[in-house]
Amino acid sequence: MHSRPNIRFLLNGRDISLDDVGASDTLLDYLRLERRLTGTKEGCAEGDCGACTVLVGRLQDGSLRYEAVNACIRLMASLDGCHVVSVEYLSGPHGKLHPVQQAMVEHHGSQCGFCTPGFIMSLYALWMQKPDPSEDEIETALQGNLCRCTGYAPIIRAAKAITEHGSPAEDALTMERDDITTRLSALQDGKRVDLRKDNSRAILPANTDDLAQVLLETPDATMVAGATDVGLWVTKFLKDISPVVFLNHLEELRKIERRDDHIHIGAGVSYSDAEAILCDEYPHLRAFWDRIAGWQIRNMGTIGGNIANGSPIGDTPPVLIALGAEITLRRGDARRTLPIEDFFVDYGKQDLVPGEFLETIRVPRPGPDARHSAYKISKRRDEDISSVCAAFNVTVQNGTIQSARIAFGGMAATPKRAASAEQALVGQTWAEASLTAAAEALAQDFSPLTDWRASAVYRMQVSKNLFRRFYAEHSGATSDVQLVRG
């Protein structure tokens, strides 16, 4: 396989080629320290505050797409073939303010100003996609941006007023779209990228077959897709992650499509890209999906990464377990498929051998008479980690429960099915008493721990109450449902 020792990308429309790139180098440090583009700020360095928000454009199926991402945890090596847009790009001739900036000024959306560039870039990304967004769409776009002083009301008013100052059709990104597309296409040479800096190494395989070969050659490599977790290993724990194999550029892993009886999801599909199809097939997931992290993280993080990470409090594994998903693992040319729940062996341990990687996820399409719900319990509504996550998939025919798949996160060392609760439901009448009895069976399935997110008692009580909530939502009996109280 032919390789090259450098990454090539565009920065605010300028061609960049770098060969001195370490596996742990971040986009934020490059912008601020190497390019002196200091409009992009460092706040949290963990993808929570949004002060470092930039846009990254990439060709996908030949089409150029821009997304808001967190520069603080976006690793430089992953930018090969991309167009990075920082807040400095928005400046017009003679310092003229961009429509997003002008709206923020006129509606007093900035006070200390530290968070303002990040808000500007998130609103810019939204405005380019939806020039006349609803308030819900604005709030969704700003989930990953925190302001400590001004408050959000003037920022939301500014977001609604952007079109008073200009149209996306007249924006530089729109006017230069064809040129940028052509230039990014010219960067696609089908070669493996192999970067070395001091003792650090980062590899971008040419395709999934090359990925399989690279992992056979370097089975101890850290695999990185969205870097929403690994990025914190770098910024918070100062961990040496080299050698790194990057996955987010591989189009084969970023495909999601409906097939006859299932949804095919490549392991590199982001939360944002999965949302359209998964939430269309399973409408109950829309509210749940909106609770996963913030907009920037959903644009970066991948479904496969959330599974492979193996966290007991990951958001998507309980949902996928309840839906009966299967995953395909690949090592070299060999593949094996297993139910997703069998992948999670113990805390920090997954059924994955050296040199093997998660390639695809297979989610069955909804069956008749199935009732679905998914719930996330956390201290904050937006951009928080789950205390408890639960997903229900129950089939009812003629008033009798025919099958049940119920899974929880935050209740054990791994995402796990509630086998005793499932067994208690099957064959029973669809009634609150049946759900209450099944909830009591949770004590046979789980012995939750106490940590700073929640106590063991709280976790068990809220999990039992989710059975009652599930029944209420699917029976219209909300006023009569009795909740467990400690």
Could you describe each region identified by the protein language model?
Residues 56-87:
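S4-like RNA-binding module at protein N-termini
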Residues 22-54:
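A basic, amphipathic helix-loop patch mediating RNA/tRNA/ribosome contacts
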Residues 81-107:
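NAD(P)H dinucleotide-binding glycine-rich loop of Rossmann-like/cofactor-binding domains
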Residues 14-23:
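Short, contiguous acidic and Ser/Thr-rich linear segments
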Residues 4, 39, 44, 64-67, ...:
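Flanking scaffold residues of small Cys/His-coordinated metal-binding clusters
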Residues 3-9:
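Short structural boundary motif marking the start of a folded domain
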